[in-house]
């Protein structure tokens, strides 16, 4: 293979490489054997057409494009490796020559990885807002949430208060004329829930069962029913029942109702304290990691970040997100329908921090390279096993999906992140 690379401008160049006849001839044979079964030529059964007759009628050149498509990925990868360059986006190919009996010559306009000039990335001083301490108030707050989840609604004597639930009939009208969707019977409405138009629920506070209240509200200007948007409406509302939450007593029985693995309230508090501590420890480590890496990126200089790298990161992030949705049983079409968004909206959402993520990836890769981080066979095996467990897949399936080079890269990146994070000092 003949390979040459010419720099055209910063992070861009022209890669020229050849595909030898030793590769071309077998590829042409494979393409011919694939297409001949579908070719109808008088005097020959399908699949029995001699190569010489095919070349005479159609020309060997008719096979060239399919053969090139089959050969190009491997040839391009080999050329990139031989040229000693790191490409970061899809190339633009151009065929320079495809002469019969001659090596094919291909040109590729490529974008190369930008130079990263590392600054300080070890022993960084960082500031984080997260804390590892778990307070009594946080434990009590979690128990109180669970306690409220077990609350029951009971009939209440007297006027409704914010947080109570009322059972109502209502009839809405605009200028004395009732409108579609403005009527309801025996509707349970939580006061303060925000279920109804702003101002509706507040006007029921202070009223008791058996009362009828004229609730006057104005529909928002952006209300979904355009014929009602911005208009004043009156809802004649009859309150049938007022209910309030009755929470269970804060005792050992409550603790057992919340968690069958504990016997006492003190045990529940201790369990929650441990869980909160573990969660806050993880959040703290994540915060230190993010702050340290952000600092390492800020200390580095990236020479002319190619726009193509940012675009590739957007596509990668979008595909990863939609893939995660798919694994949860939500197809892309279903997701866009549910959210009322489009593929373009999703791309714009990820564009916001794609440049930052791209710079972070480049700097962490540069740290891994500067430190000479590599992956041992044992580390690769452990990574495969871990991924198989995380994604509930067979180990062999993971090996099929991920090349050894990809695994080595990921392990080196993890080591670089660990170095930056573990040496950081929190101020």
Swiss-Prot record:
GO terms for molecular function: peptidyl-prolyl cis-trans isomerase activity; protein folding chaperone; ribosome binding. One of its GO terms (biological process) is chaperone-mediated protein folding. Residues 163-248 form the PPIase FKBP-type domain. It catalyses: [protein]-peptidylproline (omega=180) = [protein]-peptidylproline (omega=0). One of its GO terms (cellular component) is cytoplasm. The keyword Amino-acid biosynthesis does not apply. Belongs to the FKBP-type PPIase family. Tig subfamily. Involved in protein export. Acts as a chaperone by maintaining the newly synthesized protein in an open conformation. Functions as a peptidyl-prolyl cis-trans isomerase. This is Trigger factor. It comes from Streptococcus sanguinis (strain SK36).
